[in-house]
């Protein structure tokens, strides 16, 4: 990194090692003309309302947060000579009493030509692990002791949550075209020799293997490049190592070679991440340009956010590719706030964290390096240290290492960082939240964490609407950092009617912890909407790409670009009782949803209010689970008001919305009682996999029965039942395989009656066959597909395949067949009672439970069926 302003420390902290570590080895970056952040002053308008919902989770990594971190280079290379400073750093940044970081990005230095002396910083001349002599390469495992010394201590401090990622800034100098690990003679061209891609991969893999097998370092991931598609890595640089790789073939080749080398050493389970571009927008282009093989090899996208702004697009790129996404490096000398003093750099950092996490939905956020400045009168290795910084101005890092005093000097930027890192912990579920807030939910411990910053010189009032949770506590604990406080206990704030109203202090960052929070049960019964039944107003300039039909196309990346008096409406085909509503605003235009209304109607003319968007929603899907009681209808409409909105940006309300989702059941099926089978049987799954018939009754639409030709699945309800409905969900992505499928019922499991068939391709949701008016009594229910080739035009398979995700059977159990003594079980004692009755040696109090074949009499046939039932149990 480039040295920037000096900083004046505000305190010294020494911390003991507890059982936590969070080390992140972040790769080097350069100061760009502008950072990819908002930089705006944030003062919430009077009682700004923010809805927090357990359903509005980040889409990346299933919403699961992996943690916070920093790069170990270069600061660990500088402080690691001193066990005392190394330990203080581990405690300060990774320990329980410190930042509680848990990710360390460890730099595998390439190592420059020993004859070179152009790097002037005391910390950034990273050693390599090889020595080169007349074409002969030998490994020196004593190299890089300093960084390794810090890493080990950080791992001990962080504990079980620790994640280590290896990364490279440059290959060894002798593998480069320029003969220099700082870059090429032309910074815009590849600097790795064309015949050294495999050699470079071997180098990275061998070092990783040694760290794992010789030093016991558990490596989660490795990335071979750092800001590769830039033009500022040039030979003789005074700053650091760096290497240009072209996007496309060059980056693909190094990824695939690294995959080979890691697999060869039995390290194929280590994630290969890519490609740590300096800009969000460049990262999008770089990933898209990878070969299909390289994309498959990449387990996670790592991006820096020094430039670019297309966070939502990169999120979608990662999501559509099935990849995790990290914000793996950023920092800078920015400031924020009004007359904020020492808080200015920390408020800037808070903005960056909030923008990056909410915009990217990243599962980890990693600072470049926590220490960027060093104080030492003697310097280091003949070079002069940068000295202290002015903490009221922008500076890189969060702390300064004073080697003369053997101290770590902390700043407000450090404490602002800790408002996030200490309380939003690995494993929590990240929730999308609006404006100046970052939110996480710990479902295991029933805890909600909200972090909010205020960059205004006056107080800022906010209200957090927690009504979408099933339960929430009675108060929130507040922890605050301001110009006068560091992680201070700011008391408790009462929660009234699921509403948390707070007043943010001027130029402050506050963390709110709410205990006793529960919610987020899986949404079921998603209603399929046929695009042919979607109508609406005209889009802006009659653009045929952004029409109202985009609102129900299943993608939050597309949108309806409606204008003033705009609306979109869907005909559901029949009346539904709604249990939940989901909507996604157009990305970047979330403010246009404020004031929008959702309406419901039985006839498409007379409308009732379903929900009004009272404040700017968050990006992504927003789910509303507390709708008016007993609300039902056939038509759903979203519209915006007339006139000028209060957003201060548009002259008229614009109907901009990306997606709408609806959940519920057909109106006549709202009081259905589920019947649990006592036994499930079926045909064999494809290749005898674990996706057997039991998956059709495991309660999850995510699993499925992978049955093949002539396949079937049967449920034994344990007794005669009056059936009201059968629900079913097709296997996702293979919905067409349910077309022509049939449902049968039986009293005895031998004689079957067809009660329903699937006449169209069903949606991936719960679909229903209504049996309430058919007076159907049965003990067994079976789903099966026809024999032979599909007799329809939409199924491309050569044979019908019995693929189904879930089946639900609804009704009432009339009595447990076989439970002759009425104790709730069928067992040998029931067999004995029935046999005595048939021999005239006793009576039956519940004779109907012994009538297993439902012929209105108890005879030897029932005795045989009861014996079979008990044996099968």
Regions found by a protein language model. Give the residues of each.
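Cellulosome-associated attachment modules in secreted, modular CAZymes
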Residues: 21-22, 32-42, 665-668, 812-873
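N-terminal catalytic cores of secreted or lumenal carbohydrate-active enzymes
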Residues: 47-220, 224, 256
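Active-site neighborhood of glycoside hydrolase catalytic domains
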Residues: 199-206, 210-218, 228-333
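Aromatic/acidic polysaccharide-binding cleft in carbohydrate-active enzymes
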Residues: 327-416, 432-433
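Glycan-recognition and catalytic regions of carbohydrate-active enzymes
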Residues: 398-447, 484, 520, 556, ...
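Carbohydrate-binding surface patches
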Residues: 422, 432-474, 507
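C-terminal beta-strand-rich structural cap/linker in extracellular carbohydrate-active enzymes
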Residues: 493-518
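Aromatic, loop-rich ligand-recognition surfaces of beta-strand-rich domains
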Residues: 552-611, 617-670, 684, 697-756, ...
């Amino acid at each position: 990194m480039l040295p920037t302003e000096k900083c004046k420390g505000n305190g010294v902290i020494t911390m003991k090692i507890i059982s936590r570590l969070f080390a992140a080895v972040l790769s080097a970056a350069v100061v760009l003309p502008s950072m990819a952040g908002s930089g705006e002053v944030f003062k919430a308008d009077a009682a700004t309302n923010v809805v927090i919902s357990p359903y509005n989770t980040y889409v990346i990594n299933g919403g699961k947060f992996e943690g916070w971190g920093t790069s170990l280079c270069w600061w660990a290379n500088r402080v690691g000579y001193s066990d005392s400073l190394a330990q203080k750093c581990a405690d300060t940044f990774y320990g329980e009493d410190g930042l509680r970081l848990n990710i360390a990005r460890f730099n595998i230095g390439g190592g420059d030509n020993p004859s070179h002396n152009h790097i002037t910083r005391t910390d950034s001349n990273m050693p390599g692990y090889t020595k080169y002599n007349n074409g002969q390469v030998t490994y020196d495992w004593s190299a890089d002791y300093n960084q390794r010394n810090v890493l080990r201590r950080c791992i001990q401090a962080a504990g079980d949550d620790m994640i280590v990622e290896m990364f490279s800034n440059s290959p060894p100098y002798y593998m480069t075209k320029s003969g220099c690990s700082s870059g090429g003679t032309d910074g815009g061209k590849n600097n790795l020799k064309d015949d050294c891609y495999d050699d470079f991969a071997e180098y990275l893999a061998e070092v990783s293997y040694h760290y794992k097998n010789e030093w016991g370092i558990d490596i989660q991931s490795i990335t071979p490049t750092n800001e590769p598609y830039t033009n500022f890595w040039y030979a003789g640089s005074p700053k650091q190592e760096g290497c240009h790789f072209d996007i496309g073939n060059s980056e693909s080749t190094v990824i695939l070679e690294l995959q080979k080398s890691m697999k060869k050493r039995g390290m194929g389970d280590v994630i290969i991440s890519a490609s740590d571009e300096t800009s969000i927008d460049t990262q999008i282009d770089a990933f898209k340009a990878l070969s299909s093989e390289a994309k498959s090899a990449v387990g996670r996208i790592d991006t820096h956010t020094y430039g670019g702004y297309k966070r939502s697009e990169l999120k979608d790129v990662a999501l559509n590719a099935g990849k995790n996404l990290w914000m793996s490096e950023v920092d800078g000398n920015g400031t924020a706030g009004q007359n904020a003093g020492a808080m200015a750099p920390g408020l800037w950092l808070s903005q960056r964290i909030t923008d990056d996490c909410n915009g990217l939905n990243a599962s980890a956020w990693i600072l470049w390096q926590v220490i960027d400045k060093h104080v030492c009168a003697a310097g280091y290795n003949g070079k002069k240290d940068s000295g202290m910084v002015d903490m009221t101005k922008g500076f890189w890092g969060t702390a300064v290492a004073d080697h003369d005093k053997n101290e770590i000097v902390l700043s407000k930027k450090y404490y602002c960082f800790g408002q996030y890192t200490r309380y939003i912990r690995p494993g929590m579920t990240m929730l999308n939240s609006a404006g100046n807030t970052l939110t996480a939910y710990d479902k295991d411990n029933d805890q909600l964490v909200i972090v909010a910053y205020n960059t205004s010189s006056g107080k800022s009032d906010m209200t957090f609407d927690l009504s979408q949770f099933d339960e929430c506590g009675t108060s929130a604990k507040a922890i605050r950092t301001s110009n006068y406080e560091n992680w201070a206990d700011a008391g408790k704030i009462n929660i009234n009617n699921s509403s948390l109203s707070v007043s943010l202090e001027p130029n402050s960052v506050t963390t709110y912890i709410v205990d006793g929070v529960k919610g987020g049960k899986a949404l079921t019964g998603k209603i399929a909407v046929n695009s042919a039944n979607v109508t609406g107003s005209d889009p802006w300039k009659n653009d045929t790409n952004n029409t109202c039909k985009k609102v129900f196309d299943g993608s939050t990346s597309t949108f309806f670009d409606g204008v003033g008096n705009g609306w979109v409406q869907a005909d559901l085909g029949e009346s539904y009782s709604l249990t939940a509503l989901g909507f996604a605003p157009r990305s970047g235009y979330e403010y246009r949803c404020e004031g929008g209304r959702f309406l419901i109607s039985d006839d498409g003319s007379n409308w009732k209010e379903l929900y009004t968007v009272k404040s700017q929603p968050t990006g992504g899907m927003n789910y509303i689970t507390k709708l008016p009681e007993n609300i039902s209808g056939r038509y759903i409409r979203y519209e915006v008001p007339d006139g000028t909105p209060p957003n201060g940006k548009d002259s008229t309300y614009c109907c901009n919305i990306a997606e709408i989702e609806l959940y519920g059941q057909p109106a006549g099926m709202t009081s259905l009682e589920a019947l649990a089978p006592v036994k499930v049987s079926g045909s064999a799954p494809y290749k005898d996999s674990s996706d057997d018939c039991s998956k059709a009754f495991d309660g999850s639409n995510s699993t499925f029965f992978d049955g093949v030709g002539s396949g079937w699945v049967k449920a034994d309800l344990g007794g005669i039942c009056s059936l009201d409905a059968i629900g079913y969900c097709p296997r996702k992505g293979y919905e067409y395989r349910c077309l022509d499928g049939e449902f049968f019922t039986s009293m005895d499991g031998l004689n079957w009656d067809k009660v329903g068939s699937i006449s169209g391709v069903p949606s991936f949701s719960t679909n229903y066959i209504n049996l309430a008016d058919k007076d159907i009594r049965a003990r067994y229910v079976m789903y099966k597909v026809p024999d032979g080739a599909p007799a329809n035009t939409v199924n491309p398979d050569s044979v019908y395949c019995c693929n189904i995700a879930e089946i639900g059977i609804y009704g009432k159990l009339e009595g447990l067949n076989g439970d002759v003594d009425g104790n709730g079980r069928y067992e040998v004692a029931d067999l004995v009672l029935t046999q005595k009755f048939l021999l005239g040696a006793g009576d039956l109090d519940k004779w109907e439970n012994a009538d297993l074949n439902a012929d209105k009499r108890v005879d030897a046939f029932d005795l045989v069926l009861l014996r079979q039932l008990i044996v099968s149990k």
